[in-house]
């Protein structure tokens, strides 16, 4: 982890650069670039005013009265544009977009996103430290500023699941030694922190000792549990469940990473914040997870800003949360504000409703114009990410549970979110359990080569009637081979299609593959273009509608990718069985009684 990224923010304090900026600001030398005729949104006051901006290298040398200076090597006509700082995404996972970091950068920079805080824990869960090293190397030469975080919970629920790696505090410390790593990523093992588990305590303390961020995942925490979680040194949360939860977390003193991936809650969040009469300085914005078709169609953090404004948030509040507040959270005073002496990350938006970027400047360079990249984006070798699915072909019987007797009582997992334990009775036919009426099957097979790859099968209630099967290696957070279905035949067919592809997603119905998305890199991403990936993923979505009827907001396609997230409260299927983080126990086989 000795590799370092660009040495920011200290690069702005180069004496020669500062001297040039001072000289240009006095009017004794021309600017490198002069932006004229635009209206500047001040992210401190929220006011909009006419102003011209002079740049010297990566530095803003002058913010001055319109048309008072005309001397510059390059002049940008910003007439009709609103100027803001570059947008900052405070919590996200590139892997959720299923494309490489280079392709992701090419997608969001033209939309005005100049900085992301990337938790590469998907790569970490599959490849261990080598995956994080690859992410650092991939980010190094990209024009999109990527502040990486050290994945804190690999796996997310130790003892309840097996990932491709197991990070302890010494590994976190190694990652934190890299200047490219800005802190410890979302601490999802909430119970471990609250109960003083030595592993999690040491991981949090590693971040504190490094003087870097320690980020949280405080879903459902309140009262003594929330206090214990925060007392450890964790300072942020993006796992909000309601407007009341948002207000409670703000009052508690957490930095909020308001995420766009739960759109059904955004309206309520806007109403709560509007009721305060001001935007708290601890409200930032993030995307968390954006699927490829959503990224292609709507964008990244710009889409979150756009939706918040559509739901009634003041545009200046949304921009402030996405820029100034975010920069303060990251301890990056050079970002988030278009002001003299700060870094020249500037976006020229057409308006403050649709937020279409006409021009994007990052570090004093024009990186995108009218939706197109203006600088090269370097893709590094992806060979280290292949061959991550270590499983043989599976058979129909691998997706059946054998049992003696005539009837059985089985444990079930009830509801797609906020899961609960349930029970059901069903019959045994030809030596195998018949899935209980109204249930769907879920199977998780370890695919990282650390233990056997035998599928562990459970029964889901509240998931509707499945008329086929869906297999995915994108399955948070250990990303084992996960299959949902209504019959063993289609489940085996979908699973083998994904295994043959080296990872990805497949939908099967009536003995045929309806749709396929190969993800041969880590079983998570592809080196195909975003356009092609989005098209294939949209095909998966469409095929899914043939085999299951969704019922928003909880029974939705996205629920398939979080059904194995064992760090969340309640029962969840893993490669070890049905796991419960509260009790710390795993039920390897769902059969409770036979008669």
Swiss-Prot record:
GO terms for molecular function: adenine deaminase activity. The keyword Hydrolase applies. It holds the Pfam family Adenine_deam_C. Its cofactor is Mn(2+). InterPro entries: Adenine_deam (IPR006679), Adenine_deam_C (IPR026912), Amidohydro-rel (IPR006680), Metal-dep_hydrolase_composite (IPR011059), Metal_Hydrolase (IPR032466). One of its GO terms (biological process) is adenine catabolic process. Keywords: Hydrolase, Manganese. It comes from the Bacteria. Its EC number is 3.5.4.2. It catalyses: adenine + H2O + H(+) = hypoxanthine + NH4(+). Belongs to the metallo-dependent hydrolases superfamily. Adenine deaminase family. This is Adenine deaminase 2. It comes from Rhizobium johnstonii (strain DSM 114642 / LMG 32736 / 3841) (Rhizobium leguminosarum bv. viciae).
């Amino acid at each position: 982890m000795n590799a370092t990224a660009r040495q920011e923010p200290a690069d702005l304090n180069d004496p020669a650069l500062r001297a040039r900026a001072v000289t240009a600001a006095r009017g004794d030398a021309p600017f490198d670039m002069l932006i004229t005729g635009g209206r500047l949104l001040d992210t401190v006051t929220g006011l909009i005013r006419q102003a011209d901006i002079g740049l010297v290298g990566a530095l803003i040398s002058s913010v001055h009265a319109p048309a008072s200076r005309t001397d510059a090597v390059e002049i940008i006509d910003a007439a009709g544009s609103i100027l803001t700082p570059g947008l900052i995404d405070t919590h996200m996972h590139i892997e959720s977009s299923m494309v490489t970091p280079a392709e992701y950068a090419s997608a969001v920079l033209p939309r005005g996103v100049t900085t992301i805080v990337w938790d590469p824990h998907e790569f970490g869960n599959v490849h261990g430290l080598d995956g994080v090293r690859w992410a650092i190397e991939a980010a190094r030469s990209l024009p999109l500023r990527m502040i990486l975080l050290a994945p804190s919970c690999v796996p997310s629920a130790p003892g309840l699941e097996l990932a491709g790696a197991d990070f302890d505090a010494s590994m976190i410390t190694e990652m934190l030694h890299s200047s490219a790593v800005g802190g410890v990523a979302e601490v999802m093992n909430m119970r471990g922190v609250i109960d003083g588990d030595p592993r999690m305590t040491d991981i949090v303390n590693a971040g504190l000792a490094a003087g870097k961020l320690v980020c949280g995942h405080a879903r459902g925490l309140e009262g003594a549990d929330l206090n214990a979680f925060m007392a450890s040194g964790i300072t942020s949360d993006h796992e909000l469940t309601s407007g009341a939860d948002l207000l409670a977390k703000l009052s508690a003193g957490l930095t909020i990473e308001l995420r766009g991936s739960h759109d059904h809650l955004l309206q309520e969040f806007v109403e709560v914040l509007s009721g305060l009469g001001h935007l708290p300085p601890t409200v930032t914005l993030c995307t968390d997870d954006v699927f490829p078709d959503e990224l292609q169609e709507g964008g990244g953090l710009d889409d979150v800003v756009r939706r918040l404004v559509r739901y009634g948030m003041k545009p200046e509040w949304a921009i402030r949360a996405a820029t100034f507040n975010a920069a303060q959270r990251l301890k990056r005073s050079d970002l988030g504000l278009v002001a003299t002496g700060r870094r020249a990350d500037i976006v020229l938006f057409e308006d403050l409703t649709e937020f279409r970027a006409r021009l994007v400047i990052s570090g004093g360079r024009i990186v995108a114009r009218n939706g197109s990249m203006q600088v090269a984006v370097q893709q590094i070798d992806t060979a280290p990410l292949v061959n991550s699915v270590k499983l043989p072909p599976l058979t129909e019987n691998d997706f059946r549970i054998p049992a003696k007797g005539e009837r059985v009582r089985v444990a079930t997992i009830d509801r797609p979110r906020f899961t609960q334990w349930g029970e059901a009775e069903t019959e045994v036919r030809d030596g195998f359990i018949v899935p209980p009426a109204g249930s769907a099957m879920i199977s998780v097979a370890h695919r990282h080569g650390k233990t056997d790859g035998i599928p562990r099968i459970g029964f889901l209630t509240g998931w509707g009637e499945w008329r086929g099967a869906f297999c995915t290696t994108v399955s948070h957070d250990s990303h084992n081979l996960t299959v949902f279905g209504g019959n063993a035949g289609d489940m085996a067919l979908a699973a083998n299609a994904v295994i043959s592809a080296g990872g990805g997603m497949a939908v099967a119905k009536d003995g045929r593959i309806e749709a396929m998305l190969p993800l041969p890199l880590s079983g998570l991403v592809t080196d195909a273009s975003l356009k092609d990936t989005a098209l294939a993923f949209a095909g998966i979505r469409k095929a899914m509608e043939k085999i299951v009827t969704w019922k928003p907001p909880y029974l939705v396609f996205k629920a398939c990718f979080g059904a194995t997230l064992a760090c969340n409260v309640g029962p969840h299927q893993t490669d070890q069985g049905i796991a419960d983080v509260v009790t710390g126990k795993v039920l390897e086989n769902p059969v409770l009684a036979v008669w």
